[in-house]
Amino acid sequence: IKNFKIKIIQLNKKIKILKKNKLKIVEDKILRAINSSDANLIIFAENNYPYLIEKLKFPKIQNIINDNQTVIIGGTRTDNETKSYYNSLFAINKIKIKKFDKKILVPFGEFLPMRNFFSFIEQISGPQDFSNGLDNRLIKIGEELSFIPVICYEIIFYWKLINKINYDADILINITNDKWFGSLLGPYQHLYLTKLRASEFNKPIIRVSNNGVSAIIDNKSNILAYSKLNNYEEIEHSFTYRKNNSLFVFHKFFLFSLIFLFFITIFFSKNKTNE
């Protein structure tokens, strides 16, 4: 059994491109939220870091956290060698920065399929595509905690989340930005799909959305704490968990095959009876 104190910060940041002075306001808000907390894990949402990250350097954040703290935040980084852009999650502690680049990108949002044929959409989608990440889907925070990083709608693709490298991870951390949905059902549907992953994998999930609904979910899909939609919120929660894996994690493909064969058998049995 392990214990962690977690702080979720839901910035409710606007989607539009911010001017330089507004970027500084967002950065100051981030630093204040970090500085006021003694939580072990301080987690922000997807693309909450307001500046383009050219090198993995976050000196202002590292200067204000203690040795037992890790800040997790989403941002856009660029690789100067390949001139590629990535939608990334960063895990920042006092001495080290780890990153995960999003693997499953949103078509027409993060990249333009068949760009040569759809060039007329560039005014909406932009002239530059994001690139698919190549990192292993696992981040270790010292010896105490390992987590599976999931960015935005990647949480839907359960068969791409867990593998032989990360199946023994302690928790999943899903950062997202559902601001695009406004006040419609999208954020709640996204939360519901995240809850499914918790019980399937028998692992707790910490979900942090820019505008909500953010939540701390246990391995049985119970919501332990959550935010309201379209609010700035800070949630602190003392989190206790036990490392377990479900049968689904170990035998997901076998179980699917078994269920498929079961229904096929019923189908042919009924047809034979009708004859």
Identify the residue ranges that each predicted region occupies.
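Soluble catalytic regions of membrane-associated enzymes that act on cell-envelope
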Residues: 1-108, 138-145, 149, 153-155
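Juxtamembrane/start-of-transmembrane alpha-helix segments at the extracytoplasmic/lumenal side
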Residues: 240-260
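CN hydrolase (nitrilase-like) catalytic-core segments centered on the catalytic cysteine
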Residues: 41-73, 126, 144-234
